[in-house]
A protein has these predicted regions:
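Structural/interface elements that position substrates and couple domains in central-metabolism enzymes
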Residues: 2-74
Length: 74
């Protein structure tokens, strides 16, 4: 696996029914930042839970390179 500093970074805007599955799948292989303005949704994702319950906690855990933020400056 590549070092985090040389790994490709992917950003996905919106953690809804389209964005979150993308973050989870890409996050299994590359650093992926999921951004959403809903801080509660971001907090749930950071805790390893999909607020819409479409993605299992196990799938969320497998996305080891996924990060979640409500701060556009990160």
């Amino acid at each position: 696996m590549k070092d985090r500093n040389t790994m490709t970074t992917i950003a996905v805007v919106g953690l809804g029914y389209v964005g979150l599955p993308l973050v989870v799948e890409f996050g299994k292989h590359s650093r992926t930042i999921g951004f959403d303005i809903d801080a509660a949704k971001v907090a749930a994702c950071q805790a390893g839970h999909d607020p819409s319950r479409e993605i299992s906690d196990e799938q969320m855990r497998l996305a080891q390179h996924a990060e979640y933020s409500a701060d556009a400056l990160e």
